[in-house]
Amino acid sequence: LFTQTIVVPYLIPMLENAGAVVFTPRERDWQTNEIIIDNDTPRQGTAYVEANARGEWHPTPSPGFAFHQGSYRDNENPFLAGTARQSKATRSKKRYNLISYQPNFPEEGRYAVYVSYQTVKKSVDDASYTVWHKGEKTTFKVNQQMGGGTWVYLGTFDFDKGSSEYNRVELTSQSAHRGVVTAD
């Protein structure tokens, strides 16, 4: 068996570069600060915003993540304790719904970015996430037909201290396919 000091910096990137989708049972980020933004319980200094230009965001039929202070009990699943949101996917490049997550970073540094969503019957395979980091943007297409109800790693990025529009994550309802985009 490999230790985390080999798996995280070497083995996981090799597998991902080869096209594998890697789920790890342990945290891959070395950052000691953790920021969680959830639609159910916005935390002080963070912002969760839904913008509707085409339809609305609605609750998903299945439960979603809920932030919990303290320790979890045996068999307690935080991804079954809250709600999640969904919107009808659109092909429009100009009119779409958007969710913005804006953290308040306690210090400048490198932070891993994870997203959560629910996999539902008509989930799209190309949900569009954009990570804004120090004013730069990196866009990802995420297959929401798998990996729902857990944390999905997007990458590790440099962020400035504090809360700023230049440091945020956005999810849009844009897709090349008919279906549903979910967010949690």
Language-model features: where?
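Short, surface-exposed beta-strand/strand-loop-strand elements in extracellular ectodomains
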Residues: 119-138
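A short beta-strand element within beta-rich, extracytoplasmic domains
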Residues: 97-121
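Short beta-strands within extracellular/lumenal beta-sheet-rich domains
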Residues: 76-105
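Short beta-strand-plus-loop segments that form exposed binding edges in beta-rich domains
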Residues: 169-180
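Surface-exposed coil/turn segments at beta-strand junctions on protein surfaces, enriched
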Residues: 92-96, 106-108, 147, 160-164, ...
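Glycan-processing catalytic domains of CAZymes
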Residues: 1-30, 156, 160-162, 171-173
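Extracellular carbohydrate-recognition regions
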Residues: 26-63
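Extracellular carbohydrate recognition and processing domains
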Residues: 134-164
